[in-house]
């Protein structure tokens, strides 16, 4: 397959380069990624500033470009200007940290994949759980991404669906399997700590602890139980459950 590879951690991040090195052995890969760390940029795009594109050399034989914009910019610029028309799939990752539960709404990784789907290119986001002060398991995550990719044939790919793949932090032997599941609730209970600086201004820092109230059958639940999770996402945010009710309420 012809694959466009991007991320939100930046073009020099270990995750995207681990994935590129493995995928390029079996597929044609073009990397277009932010020049710097752009985590939690969600689906933001650059409007008021020019976007700078630089060609980057990689140790493995792939075409690579850094972009001064956001992850969503990377996909937009790539599909409009940099890559051929025959891209079969956009893959975003491997992200340093999970993208499950409500966190997907903040994720630049997931949003880059969604941008691909908005361009009618099938897409997948790949994220690996990160534990502070421990070595990331990008090689395991890359293996699972390749496994998912190899299960697909071009005719199987739906161009409006984003596959969200998350890999727990554990050894390959400890992984219990793969679960196709729905999005869960929030991972963390977040809050802001407050300090006062020398000039009397409030200084707020985001803090939080793990949310223990999780729902069975969700990505959050299965990740905590050492399963790889795969969730199909869609960019249509319509709440169909109350569409008719809303019409009756406001138009009747």
Curated annotation (Swiss-Prot):
Alphabetical UniProt keywords: Cytoplasm, Hydrolase, Metal-binding, Nucleotide-binding
Disulphide bridges: none
Matches recorded under Pfam families: SurE
Gene3D superfamilies assigned to the protein according to its UniProt record, in alphabetical order: Survival protein SurE-like phosphatase/nucleotidase
Positions with a binding annotation for a divalent metal cation: 8-9, 39, 95
Gene Ontology cellular-component terms listed: cytoplasm
Name of the protein this chain belongs to: 5'-nucleotidase SurE
Name of the gene encoding the protein in the UniProt record: surE
């Amino acid at each position: 397959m012809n694959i466009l590879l991007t991320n939100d951690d930046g073009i020099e991040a270990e995750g995207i380069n681990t994935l590129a090195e493995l995928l390029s052995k079996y597929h044609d890969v073009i990397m277009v990624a932010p020049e710097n760390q752009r985590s939690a940029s969600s689906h933001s795009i650059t409007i008021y500033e020019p976007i700078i594109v630089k060609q980057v050399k990689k140790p493995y034989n792939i075409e690579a470009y850094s972009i001064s914009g956001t992850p969503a910019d990377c996909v937009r610029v790539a599909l409009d200007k940099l890559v051929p028309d025959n891209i079969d799939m956009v893959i975003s990752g491997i992200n340093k940290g999970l993208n499950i539960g409500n966190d997907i709404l903040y994720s630049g990784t997931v949003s880059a994949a969604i941008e691909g789907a908005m361009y009618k290119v099938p897409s997948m986001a790949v994220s690996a759980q990160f534990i502070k002060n421990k070595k990331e398991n990008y090689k395991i995550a890359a293996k699972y991404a390749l496994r998912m990719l190899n299960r697909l044939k071009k005719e199987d790919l739906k161009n409006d669906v984003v596959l969200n793949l998350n890999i727990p932090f554990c050894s390959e032997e400890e992984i219990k399997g793969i679960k196709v599941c729905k999005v869960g609730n929030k991972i963390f209970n977040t809050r802001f700590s407050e300090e006062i600086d020398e000039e009397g201004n409030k200084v707020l820092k985001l803090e939080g602890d793990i949310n223990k109230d999780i729902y069975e059958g969700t990505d959050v639940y299965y990740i905590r139980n050492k399963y790889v999770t795969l969730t199909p996402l869609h960019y249509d945010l319509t709440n169909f459950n109350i569409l008719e009710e809303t019409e009756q309420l406001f138009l009747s």
